[in-house]
Amino acid sequence: MAELPVTEMPGDALCSGRFTISTLLGGDEPPPAACDNSQPSHLTHGSTLYLRTFGYNTIDVVPAYEHYANSALPGEPRKVRPTLADLHSFLKQEGSHLHALAFDGRPGHELTDGLVEDETGANSEKSPGEPVRFGWVKGVMIRCMLNIWGVILYLRLPWITAQAGIVLTWLIILLSVMVTSITGLSISAISTNGKVKSGGTYFLISRSLGPELGGSIGLIFAFANAVGVAMHTVGFAETVRDLLQENGTPIVDPINDIRIIGVVTVTVLLAISLAGMEWESKAQVLFFLVIMVSFANYLVGTLIPASKDKASKGFYSYHGDIFVQNLVPDWRGIDGSFFGMFSIFFPSATGILAGANISGDLKDPAVAIPKGTLMAIFWTTISYLAISATIGSCVVRDASGDVNDTITPGPGLCEGLACGYGWNFTECSQQHSCRYGLINYYQTMSMVSAFAPLITAGIFGATLSSALACLVSAAKVFQCLCEDQLYPLIGFFGKGYGKNKEPVRGYLLAYAIAVAFIIIAELNTIAPIISNFFLCSYALINFSCFHASITNSPGWRPSFRYYSKWAALFGAVISVVIMFLLTWWAALIAIGVVLFLLLYVIYKKPEVNWGSSVQAGSYNLALSYSVGLNEVEDHIKNYRPQCLVLTGPPNFRPALVDFVSTFTQNLSLMICGHVLIAPGKQRVPELRLIASGHTKWLNKRKIKAFYSDVIAEDLRSGVQILMQASGLGRMKPNILVVGFKKNWQSAHPATLEDYIGILHDAFDFNYGVCIMRMREGLNVSEALQTHTAPEALVQEEQTSTIFQSEQGKKTIDIYWLFDDGGLTLLIPYLLHRKKRWGKCKIRVFVGGQINRMDEERKAIISLLSKFRLGFHEVHVLPDINQKPQVEHTKRFEDMIAPFRLNDGFKDEATVAEMRRDYPWKISDEEINKNRIKSLRQVRLNEILLDYSRDAALIILTLPIGRKGKCPSSLYMAWLETLSQDLSPPVLLIRGNQENVLTFYCQ
């Protein structure tokens, strides 16, 4: 119950710019005329609530950011809007407090925090411990550009241009950019659909598609970034090794030099990362400036006339014939193919997620990610196209590097464009021994530039910045994945340190993975490995955007509008296609890993709820199919037993729940009905609390069922509501399942009338009826009218029942005494299909005449064979109408004796009054009219004891008592007599007399 403290105020202070306690309580009293409404009121319980509402007679608050935020800002109390109970219920003053006379599910302090506490700190100064946040330029654009401008730009783009030619190189670049641009648009849409936290790509995919795909791609993406650290570090190490070799100072040998330099370099990068995001960001800005200077240096170098040394290496400045020759491809080596070049180049376009991966460190991710990412894609694309075109116009493919290879007078043979510029590289070209030229020399950009050390510095800046960005991305993404605890044994790496919650342990793990791949020491081997992982990530990002759009969920409202769901789908498909065109076996491995991780999360079912598009899609499918079912006419072949089970709280009836679930699981509808009895609907607010608890209990027990509760004045009216309102369209119950009322002889007669009345109501609503009785009882009357604290339901130990275990090689005995449409046969058939009941033998017992036993048995066997149920053992009971034993008859008479009117010698008026006052009692006339039927129940019990004492389950046709002609106590006596003294569970079934089995094919 929410409490609002009331402070005593003098009369002249009863002024309010918002509301007063007097108007709040009285509802009609206006404020005093002397009030100065320009001053804030003190009648707001000592709070600033008056700042959050307006007008008189209301505690409604105006819209505010705090009401929708999941957490309060640092230094501020949590603020919440008033609940519906606060606004709707009557407020009663008791002493100095106002009590809302309604159930409030929130803790009392939460309301106080929201409505009463002073909003101090709303304009509080920035906390000195607040983490560093970046804008779109420094945080996203520069970071993405640095990650895109990696080792491939300087060391492989000239070589790719020589292999593929300028035209196909542009096609490779534009194809890569098309994929990344579409992905960039998808990332922009997803990142602007709500507040983005840390976790980058993993956070965006997991919150869009759900934990299943999000978790798998998060793990793969973190791993791909860790391998990316190795790729860029190896590129840096190659450059340093070449410099050492040119100066004649190698460390060991070419391969081991790369390994040594790479490990030392990645260790330094680890130290920078551990210093914090602020230092890492400063290092990135420095690298960016170095790269820009190196670009300018390269472009100036292409304009400077070639020196003799550069000419010997194939550089002749801009010439049209060089440009024309380099337009077409000249494939060489094992990687000499379009997709071979594409697989090597594509990782250089994959840095578009570098900004999104530090989403938790951005000031406004929703603005920074779209703007910075798309600008980075644009500028880097221009740079790639420009470098490919310019270097392809200046440098020939083959050159010896020997300054003496000039053309000499004489008849010697000279081939190639270099001949026109006075150089003869024919010998090395024919012998494939040229060490220089566009296709042979990886450091061509350095050679072309005006000042080679600046290109080397650019290579250092590009490789180190990309490696640093990948290291940070890998750790940040993995940290968020660890915090969500979707996978076991990784929570250790999720711990954050310092004001920025730096993932130190994640850095160390990424460092270890990077070192392992640096040992490979071959850039062309590492690059294709991560291409598939990045493409897999892009495919899922695009699919996330498409899926969220196609579900038409009201929650999908990205502020970034320049995206297309069909472009996103195309991006997803083309990413998968490219994966297989690049390296089909690596694509299969990547998809296999994703599927394995996906199935693991599906199996574990983590308790997270992120409002994913998968959930929205599930709703759409369910809605579409449910509406579609309305157009389908009922047919016997499509009949399914859809059960409304009167469990009360399901945890009070585990045996009943388990039994019904056995034949409805994955087949039909099961609803656990619960009637809360309360006059005047006083317990309405409880429903939302207890419903979630009971649903979680069902889920924990792995029962596929719905929980439905209603509040009613009495049990019978509540069940009537359930029977009429439960279900949706064709998905409505057609069978009412109840437990046997074991205490009917001692219970209040009104509850007995309700119980039998419920059965009559079920038949009136055209329901079939099943009554389950177990020897140990089900506590029907208590369970149907009681409930437990919902918060304790999930924690309580799950009660085991006999229906959860194997039933062995016992029998399921079916007493098909009367034809109810076939429901008495269908339910045991469905049970027998389940593994727990599969070893049981089914026996069918029918009534018959002793002189026609064989004929009747053959007739029933023939009928059962037409139903294709697989029931072959049939027994005919010829003595079903024999008189029962005297002592059993006597026991029945003793059972009904307390419920008799004994009206045989009373006048008619007295008898009529007695029947009106005691409708459950049995008159002498009713006993006489139903004597044969009563004796039949006694005799049937004797037969059950003779034939089915050791059965796993007894199923028999439920007798029907005619409404108004059979008192409730007599009917209960029949049910009691039928099922008493039996050890196996007994299920009494009566269909609605409509066929549920057919032997026709249409």
From Swiss-Prot:
Q: What does the record say about PTM?
A: Ubiquitinated; ubiquitination is essential for regulation of endocytosis. Phosphorylated at Thr-53, Thr-58 and Ser-71 by OXSR1/OSR1 and STK39/SPAK downstream of WNK4, promoting its activity. Phosphorylated in response to IL18.
Which segments cross the bilayer?
Answer: 136-165, 166-187, 219-241, 254-278, 279-301, 337-358, 370-391, 452-475, 506-520, 526-542, 566-585, 586-597
Kindly list the positions at which Phosphothreonine occurs in this protein.
44, 48, 53, 58
Q: Which family does it belong to?
A: Belongs to the SLC12A transporter family.
The residues the record assigns to binding chloride are 351-353, 538
Q: Which positions in this protein are listed as binding ATP?
A: 646, 653, 675, 739, 778-779
Q: Please name the InterPro entries in this protein's record.
A: AA-permease/SLC12A_dom (IPR004841), AA_permease_N (IPR013612), SLC12_C (IPR018491), SLC12A3 (IPR002948), SLC12A_fam (IPR004842)
Name of protein: Solute carrier family 12 member 3
Notes on activation and inhibition: Phosphorylation by OXSR1/OSR1 and STK39/SPAK in kidney distal convoluted tubules downstream of WNK4 promotes its activity. Also activated by OXSR1/OSR1 and STK39/SPAK downstream of WNK3. Activated by isotonic conditions. Inhibited by thiazide-type diuretics including polythiazide, metolazone, bendroflumethiazide, trichloromethiazide, hydrochlorothiazide and chlorthalidone. Thiazide drugs specifically inhibit SLC12A3/NCC transporter activity by competing with chloride for binding.
At what positions is Phosphoserine found?
41, 47, 71, 89, 124
Q: Name one GO biological process term.
A: potassium ion import across plasma membrane
GO CC term (a single one): vesicle
